[in-house]
Amino acid sequence: MRPMVFEYPCDPVAAYLETQYMLGDALLVAPVLREDKKVQYYLPEGRWTDYFTGEVKTGGRYYEGEYDYFSLPLYVKENTLLATGAVNDRPDYDYRDGATLHLYELADGATCTCRMVDVKGADVCTITAERRGGVYTLKADADMNGLTVMLHGICAEGVTAENARIHADSVSGCASAVISTSTREIKITLE
């Protein structure tokens, strides 16, 4: 958990943001602090995806919304590869087992990396995602069998993949690839 100014030292607004914070380097959190449930938050420059709804917003400005105590503004920064676990009722489990890798708004020519750790914090797998045109390549230093990769914010007529089964949803703007073979690299192509 870090103040906004640590992640965005060149953004003059970030120095004055006391009611929101960064969770790691990719998640922006703006807690509900008012009884009327209204939250005003600032998104720095770039594209930000609402973690819960998938709505994409442009940064460099303030937003306001009404939330209850079971929701809050939680945004994922563009060019982020975020791992989520399959178990949500306990903190100590094999995080890699059944995990989903969420790839948010990866720009053409960009790369991003995600480290997966065990319950003691030791690295078990590091995955790098790269985009070249309509081809997304994910490479890992360990076997990726059993993982799911979800691409957020895509528009494509067709999606194909090597070493994975594909499901594309044009309504949500997401495509997912379930890795069902022992491999350390997959390529997902958007058409």
Task: Show where each model-derived region lies.
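Solvent-exposed beta-strand/loop surfaces of large extracellular or lumenal domains
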Residues: 51-69, 160-179
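Conserved catalytic/binding loops enriched for acidic/polar residues
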Residues: 120-123, 159, 186
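Catalytic core of carbohydrate-active enzymes
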Residues: 1-154
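Short, ordered beta-strand-loop transition motifs
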Residues: 34, 128-135, 166-174, 181
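Surface-exposed interaction regions enriched in Ser/Thr/Asp/Glu
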Residues: 176-191
